[in-house]
Amino acid sequence: MEEWLRKHMWPALPDHQHHPSYDILLAEPWVQFLDMTPFFRQKLYNTLSKINEMRKSCIIYPPQAEIMSWSYLCAPEDVKVVIIGQDPYHGGQANGQAFSVNKGFPVPPSLQNIFKEVRSCYPDFVSPGHGCLEEWGRQGVLLLNTILTVEAKKPGSHSDLGWTWFTNLIISTLSNKLNNCVFMLWGSKAIAKSLMINKQRHLVLKAQHPSPLAAKNNYSSSQCKFLGCGHFLTANKYLTQHNKVPIDWTLE
């Protein structure tokens, strides 16, 4: 794969440069799991350097130190559920984990709907009054945006900055190396990633995006509405059937 990318997609990068994990902000277990060769490290380092330079002239979210925060919540071998988002919140609340915000920020509308759906599956669930999903992450729920940065108040502004190859690598490697994970794909951009997932080894759940806009939209779609999709209950049933500890969706 690397040789094909070198030849067809990217200009040649120097082989002799070696960037340690802290240079590319990625937790070491993920560096090893993704087989981050010097070539891949250089490519990721270049993207991060470009974004860091852009911060001198515009506001970018999340902060540089939080871009890879998703990689520090659980080891790759412990991932059980993958929730794929689009790009980070662009209003200052992004923290490097899809749909999540740090405590102290208002709960975004999409996350409010996610909490509604959890409560639909588990009536005892109580919305925590905050939007921090780190407790899910520590149990093996990977909250991954396909684009890892965004310019303030400009959604989708970093879609062409070089993140797609990296997040595609994460998704495909999880699919290839793990077994019996649940991939939750909400919205057309996330659903497009289903082509990278081995459906013989994993459960793929699809629905419309949890945003209120998608919920109100009456356009024709082959995907079920997010509210009422039952994904959180279905995921735990699947994990239990495959001798994995189900996710406790409770948030304190």
Curated annotation (Swiss-Prot):
Keyword GTP-binding part of the UniProt annotation: no
Record-level GO BP terms: base-excision repair, AP site formation via deaminated base removal
Enzyme active site: 87
Keyword terms of this UniProt record: DNA damage, DNA repair, Host nucleus, Hydrolase
Xref: SMART domains: UDG, UreE_C
Gene3D superfamilies listed in its UniProt record: Uracil-DNA glycosylase-like domain
SUPFAM superfamilies according to UniProt: Uracil-DNA glycosylase-like
PANTHER family: URACIL-DNA GLYCOSYLASE (PTHR11264:SF0)
Name of this chain's protein: Uracil-DNA glycosylase
Organism, as annotated: Alcelaphine herpesvirus 1 (strain C500) (AlHV-1)
Gene: 46
